[in-house]
A protein has these predicted regions:
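Nucleic-acid endo/exonuclease domains
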Residues: 1-111
Length: 111
């Protein structure tokens, strides 16, 4: 199965679950497209890219944006599972951050 088809299945899954996404590379020139992700989910700050020659540099540059790479060996089911795990990890990290901030505010107000 082609990687573009896997990306379309992932987009279908995102639509089904009402998760907003953007496809920034479709509007770009060929040079800029090389450096951009194929799909971006702003709510969870997740970047998705189809595997190619530039992927390693892209991964290092976008490491803080929770990168997900679509490889030739991935099945659509595995890709969706990988996306679910990434979304879950981001949500847990956000919750930890909010709880930490809430604790800071409480200790500050108790002084």
């Amino acid at each position: 199965m082609k990687n573009e088809t896997k990306l379309k299945k992932l987009v279908g899954w995102l639509d089904k679950n009402n998760i907003e996404y953007r496809c920034p590379s479709k509007e770009m020139s060929k040079y800029k497209r090389k450096k951009r992700s194929d799909l971006f989910i702003p709510k969870f700050v997740i970047s998705v890219r189809i595997d190619d020659d530039y992927t390693q540099k892209w991964y290092r540059a976008h490491y803080d944006m929770n990168p997900v790479v679509i490889r030739d060996t991935d099945t659509p089911r595995f890709l969706i599972k990988k996306m679910q795990n990434t979304i879950t990890r981001v949500m847990v990290n956000q919750q930890k951050y909010y709880m930490k901030e809430h604790d800071k505010k409480e200790t500050k107000s108790n002084r």
